[in-house]
């Protein structure tokens, strides 16, 4: 296997950081909570910038993995980062979703941070080692342009519109339900809500919404139709924010960016500045909606709430506030590291096998085997009222303990195949292989969820994603 020497030197830098993580984990330099959060926050920001620079040097583009690592750091270490940037006083210890609520001491947060950081470094180093630009490998393929008949393209678009029609009402109904739950009972109620009957069917049908959007953005050539799909997607993203789901917004934002920067090449260096400004506004809106959600019980006057929330965010640094809220995944990471295997035994890989179980419908009633994940096992140790979610690093540690460093190294290699595949379908001429493009973009959409969740439901999601492919094979011959 050929390994680029420059890539190996970059990977060695990350392995050096991994070794430094191990030394710092053993040393326990600080015990006071404030000092721990400030140090780990500065460390996370510094290593994030360095890692992203090394990844960009490796790939020469802003690709899926670079975005995945950036989002991962924001979620996995966000609360430490918010303390470093905004000060310890910005973390209210009364709020149970803040890591300084009193459940963990400084030593526990310190050790969990540096071990999870080791996993991130192993993950990124592996990617850099195995990544290769497939420009020369696919040179012959790029010269082949497939002629797609208009009749075939029309049928492929019809598949996407059919799935969109099937899913649009269930999707927006469930979003409306979440928003109404927040207005009446508060945000925490959406985290505890369960569905049954028609709502369970609606939840399943809503799986087709992102699938149909990705499919149509690839197959639909008419600009007005594509604009309609984009407006529908932006409406969905906005309502997801109001309903409390930030990770769904990140998933669509990443996919839209990848499609329009790599696949359609509509985003270049000149309009990248505008994109960053739009991103900053988006972060402010995210924080604003989050603040309104938490303050909604204090007033029924919406304009008054928006004004008060906007002023508070501007005065208290909305970026710090966003990091604090997104970074509560750091709590589940710390909890898993603290309680496993002392209270909860290792899963020994069974967590990953549950992806297969999620394909089988729950015909026998009760708890579905695939629903037993990091969140359901560990969250009750911290809070009896709400779930804490999960992350791919927490899941790796729960399964294999210290061997999860090797697991994350393997995951890094797997992610290289996704980006190499994306490179291939995004090259001129190969764009005609739309089915392959759909598969890779959907995989990206699916994997982003792993930043904030376990992979136990991935099997079912892949099964749903296969539906338009099967329909395509049946209807088009």
Q: Where are the regions that the model predicts?
A:
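N-terminal "leader" segments that precede or initiate the main folded domain
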Residues: 1-143, 252-287, 453-477
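Membrane-interfacial loop-to-transmembrane alpha-helix junctions, especially the N-terminal start
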Residues: 5-15, 59-72, 157-160, 223-230, ...
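Hydrophobic, membrane-inserted alpha-helices
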Residues: 19-24, 46-48, 208-214, 231-239, ...
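Membrane-embedded catalytic interface detector for glycan/lipid assembly enzymes
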Residues: 34-36, 95-103, 131-268, 279-298
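Hydrophobic, aromatic-rich transmembrane alpha-helices
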Residues: 46-52, 209-221, 407-424
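Hydrophobic alpha-helical transmembrane segments
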Residues: 104-124, 196-211, 318-329
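Small-residue-enriched transmembrane helix-hairpin modules in multi-pass membrane proteins
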Residues: 187-195, 283-411
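Hydrophobic alpha-helical segments
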Residues: 385-477
């Amino acid at each position: 296997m050929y390994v680029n020497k420059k890539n190996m030197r970059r990977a060695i830098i990350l392995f050096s950081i991994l070794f430094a993580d191990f030394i710092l984990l053993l040393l326990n330099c600080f015990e006071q909570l404030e000092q721990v959060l400030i140090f780990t926050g500065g460390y996370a920001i510094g290593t994030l910038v360095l890692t992203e620079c090394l990844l960009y040097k490796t790939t020469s583009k802003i690709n899926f993995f670079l975005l995945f690592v950036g989002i991962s750091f924001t979620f996995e270490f966000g609360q430490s980062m918010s303390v470093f940037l905004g000060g310890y006083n910005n973390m209210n210890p009364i709020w149970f979703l803040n890591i300084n609520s009193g459940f963990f001491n400084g030593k526990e947060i310190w050790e969990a941070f540096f071990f999870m950081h080791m996993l991130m470094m192993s993950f990124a180093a592996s990617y850099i080692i195995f990544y290769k630009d497939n420009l020369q490998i696919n040179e012959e393929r790029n010269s082949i342009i497939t002629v797609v008949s208009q009749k075939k393209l029309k049928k492929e678009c019809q598949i996407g519109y059919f799935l969109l029609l099937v899913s649009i009402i269930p999707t927006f109904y469930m979003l409306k339900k979440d928003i109404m739950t927040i207005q009446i009972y508060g945000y925490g109620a959406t985290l505890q809500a369960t569905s049954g009957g028609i709502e369970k069917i609606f939840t399943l049908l809503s799986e087709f919404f992102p699938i149909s959007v990705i499919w149509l953005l690839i197959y639909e050539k008419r600009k007005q139709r594509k604009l309609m799909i984009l407006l529908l997607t932006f409406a969905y993203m906005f309502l997801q924010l109001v309903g409390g789901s930030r990770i769904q917004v990140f998933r669509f934002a990443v996919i839209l960016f990848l499609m329009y920067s790599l696949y359609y090449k509509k985003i270049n260096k000149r309009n990248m500045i505008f994109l960053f400004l739009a991103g900053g506004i988006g972060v402010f809106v995210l924080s604003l909606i989050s603040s309104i959600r938490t303050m909604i019980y204090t007033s029924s006057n919406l304009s008054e709430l928006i004004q008060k929330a906007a002023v508070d965010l501007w005065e208290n640094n909305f970026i710090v506030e966003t990091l604090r809220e997104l970074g509560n995944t750091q709590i589940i990471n710390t909890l898993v590291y603290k309680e496993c295997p002392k209270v909860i035994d290792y899963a020994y890989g069974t967590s990953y096998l549950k992806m297969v179980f999620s394909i089988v419908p729950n015909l026998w009633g009760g708890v579905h085997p695939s629903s037993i994940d990091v969140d359901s096992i560990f969250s009750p140790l911290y809070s009896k009222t709400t779930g804490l979610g999960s992350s791919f690093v927490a899941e790796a540690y729960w399964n294999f303990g210290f061997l999860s460093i090797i697991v994350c190294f393997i995951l890094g290699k797997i992610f290289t195949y996704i980006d190499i595949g994306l490179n291939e379908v995004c090259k001129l001429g190969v764009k005609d292989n739309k089915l392959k493009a759909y598969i890779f973009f959907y995989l990206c959409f699916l994997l982003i969820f792993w930043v904030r969740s376990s992979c136990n439901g991935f099997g079912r999601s892949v099964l749903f994603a296969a539906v338009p492919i099967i329909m395509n094979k049946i209807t088009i011959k």
